[in-house]
Amino acid sequence: MNKMNYIVRQTEDSVLLKSILTGYPAFVVAGVLFSAIMEFRIVYPFFIILYILNSLTNKVFKNVIFKPSMGTEATRRPSGMGGTVGRTDTPYGCGLFASGKISKTSGFPSGHSQFAAMAATFWILYVLRQYRKEGKWRHHGAKEYICMALKILPFVVMALLVMTQRVQSRCHSITQVVVGAAFGIVIGVFGFKVYQHTMEYKTRKV
């Protein structure tokens, strides 16, 4: 198994970035809860709800919608996962907490890629909203555009690293990763739109 280790510099978003980097939802929830304790914002519990929705959606995709096609090339996990090249009964040996047991789940779509794309999409839109709300890019020009890009870029890079690792470790095929990412982006946009409308309604009510 090809293990990839990444180091993220300490920033105000480092907990979230590291969580997205690992691709393990449990770490993300812990990171968001930690951030909420340090400085409570309604966006944190909202994101946890979105995470639960995303997880349930992925389970429905794998265990209901695409389960009938288990065994086909599109849904089967790639041969060679966990160092078992040429076998079709590849063990679940690519995760951080690998059990070594035979994988019984569909590889379509990639749950890690779906989550990484969802999280990155949501937080990127959140950063853009904050800049629009504060009107920074209208008053400071290029400097604020650069600062905004530097805040957004890590989320993009982290999501891409997760997706790349899922393919290189042969946990998923490229198709499974791309489709998972597409679903994640849709859920991320949907979740942010709901959050945005919720905040606008709250503001009007006040």
Task: Tell what function each PLM region has.
Residues 1-105:
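N-terminal transmembrane-helix/juxtamembrane module of multi-pass inner/ER membrane proteins
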Residues 40, 78-206:
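Membrane-embedded catalytic cores of phosphoryl/pyrophosphoryl-handling enzymes
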